Amino acid sequence: MTLHKVQTHAEGQVLPRQDQLAWKIAELATSDRPMDAEAVIMVGNRLLDNAAVALGAINREPVRHARLLALGYAHPQQRGATLFGLPPELTFHCEWAALANGVAVRELDMHDCYLAADYSHPGDNIPAVLAAAQQRRCNGAALTRALLTSYEIQMALVTGICLHEHKIDHVAHLAPAVAAGVGTLLGLPTETVYQAVNQSVHLACATRQSRKGDITSWKAYAPGQAGKTALEAVGRVLLGECAPSPIYEGRDAVIAWMLSGPDVEYWVPLPDSTQPLRAILDSYTKQHSAEYQAQALIDIGFALHARGLDLDSVTDVLTRPSHHTHHVIGTGSNDPQKMDPDSSRETLDHSVMYILAVAWEDGAWHHVDSYTSERAHRPSTVSLWQKIRTEEASDWTQAYHATDFRNKKFGAEVVVTLSNGDQVIESLDNPNAHSLGASPFARADYIGKLRTMGDGVADPDEIDRFIGLVEDLERLSADDVARLNIVVPADRLQDTSAERVGIL
């Protein structure tokens, strides 16, 4: 692994292409290297995980609307990409399939994560890369290599370059990862991938208002849009077009004007040319449908529920988490919406105060029932909810940013004060399902998650067929990859036909 320095180049100088981060990303995407067996297994796990959460969200309004958008772009030769839930005989332009399937995967906020200098859901790469693989008739081995590239690039960028301190959304690291992954998928030249990466970054820098205040369904659309943008960038470059460069180091580029400025150095870790791509092994999924930093708080809520405390005797609940938890989903965000029962589902799944209150009261968590308006307005919940506050704890922030993965912690400590002055303390280093947690997710757990989320949505035989394809991922033919999708019976799937072509 080599740390690459990235900073704005000097005024009046030309930064050689080989010294630009986008070129180094492109070189990684176009290098031939061995595949790691554990990493390949994890690719399969991520496919299962994405399918699970997409099934669970298949008829939610944002997903239905995204599907309606894509339905207007059927592929004229019927050799495009599939839409999640629809038969493989129906294919659509890969860009629009990437959007629709990306929304389905992201909607429930329940798939994988990687948290470092910035935040990410690297599973967001999968819908776009898979759509490109289906349209270009790629086999399972090519798809696997491509996804390993996408994970490596996004997670390297998230490790080295913080976006959120400048209120830039993390999809700015997703789009170049998709472009690089598609470069690997199609065996494109380094020059082509370089141009596509530059174009993707140029178009994907959006603000974090999508995750602040009144959070809407755009939180689910944002990664799908980034994937669509990246595929369009690759397509444009394949026609011979070029892109703004150097997109990271230029005097008027991202670092100079959107991030920390021309005098700051970033360090991005990329594996050497002979090393296998293993970053995916440092990603981790969610057991519960909520922002990742709330996962451990849900598990803590279960532990508090088991104590059987009299909730009426609770006077104060101090949650001591990391900087991220406090400022993004805690009271440090200064978002009154996070304390409001009338807030959107997208806002509530980013409110650790609400999440802890519900998990504590119920001793359970459900991706739908835990967010209903009735649930949010329960008087006992509102009372407990308003007593919960967060306060950044430096030890948790330090553990969050630990450079050694084995020392990372994404948990918190909760101090409950009772009316008699007694205190009850619950602490958890990592969510139970985390690879460092009490019960790390393995292949059987991902399959179980898929069966649970798909219950009553897809037929068990269809889920078994999909699992069988994933189990044989590296050996899948192009025809198999074209069917790497779960079909939902027509009577269980809403909004499956479009009366229009185009957005309006």
Report the location of each language-model feature.
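Terminal-appendage/accessory-domain detector
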Residues: 1-119, 218-228, 235-504
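Generic structural signal for well-ordered, non-membrane alpha-helices
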Residues: 23, 27, 49, 127, ...
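Well-ordered alpha-helical scaffold segments within catalytic/enzyme domains
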Residues: 32, 56-57, 129-136, 179-185, ...
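Hydrophobic alpha-helical hairpins/lids featuring a short glycine-rich hinge
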Residues: 101-157
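Short amphipathic alpha-helical face segments that pack within enzyme cores
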Residues: 123-131, 173, 177-181, 292-299, ...
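Glycine-rich, mobile lid/loop segments that gate access to catalytic sites or pores
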Residues: 133-228, 232, 246-247, 251
